[in-house]
Amino acid sequence: WASQVSENRPVCKAIIQGKQFEGLVDTGADVSIIALNQWPKNWPKQKAVTGLVGVGTASEVYQSTEILHCLGPDNQESTVQPMITSIPLNLWGRDLLQQWGAEITMPAPLYSPTSQKIMTKMGYIPGKGLGKNEDGIKIPVEAKINQKREGIGYPF
């Protein structure tokens, strides 16, 4: 599972005890939280010993009485003992994200800062294609090695 940062929130699905849930990936949350209205009535819960900070004013905070089996978005095996409260959507916190091997990466730019400045001075607009109508290719051309040593640049 991968998600690029955009206007859309990064949500993914997880299967907890055989039931599918969708939740927001929240690297700022220590623990995962299931929305009270999505918690199955027949699953046991207890009043939480600790409160939750950062989710508004949660008056009723519960926690699962059991450690639950969970499958991540790419079927990663994990366990979770989620908190349960009245929130609009489920939150996948670092307790699950670590078990799923989640990473935050920022890829290095394709071109050096110097070449980016040169291209910008020449009128290049990032995300647009090259050419008069800015409709040319938008991704770099991949260099291929000519193993046969035939064609342009090689003698007949």
Curated annotation (Swiss-Prot):
Species of provenance: Homo sapiens
Pfam family, one: G-patch
Keyword check for tRNA-binding: no
Enzyme class: hydrolase
Enzyme Commission no: 3.4.23.50
Protein name according to UniProt: Endogenous retrovirus group K member 25 Pro protein
Gene Ontology biological process terms from the UniProt entry: proteolysis; viral translational frameshifting
Peptidase A2 domain location: 21-96
UniProt function note: Retroviral proteases have roles in processing of the primary translation products and the maturation of the viral particle. Endogenous Pro proteins may have kept, lost or modified their original function during evolution. This endogenous protein has retained most of the characteristics of retroviral proteases.
Domain G-patch: 111-156
One GO molecular-function entry: nucleic acid binding
Domain of life: Eukaryota
Cited InterPro entries: Aspartic_peptidase_AS, G_patch_dom, HERV-K_Pro_peptidase_A2, Peptidase_A2_cat, Peptidase_aspartic_dom_sf, Retropepsin-like_cat_dom, Retropepsins
Keywords tagged on the record: Aspartyl protease, Autocatalytic cleavage, ERV, Hydrolase, Protease, Transposable element
Active site: 26
Subunit structure: Active as a homodimer.
Catalysed reaction, written as an equation: Processing at the authentic HIV-1 PR recognition site and release of the mature p17 matrix and the p24 capsid protein, as a result of the cleavage of the -SQNY-|-PIVQ- cleavage site
SUPFAM superfamilies assigned to the protein according to its UniProt record, in alphabetical order: Acid proteases (SSF50630)
CDD domains listed in its UniProt record: HIV_retropepsin_like
Post-translational modification: Autoproteolytically processed at the N-terminus. Expected C-terminal autoprocessing not detected. The sequence shown is that of the processed Pro protein.
Membership in a protein family: Belongs to the peptidase A2 family. HERV class-II K(HML-2) subfamily.
Keyword Methyltransferase found: no
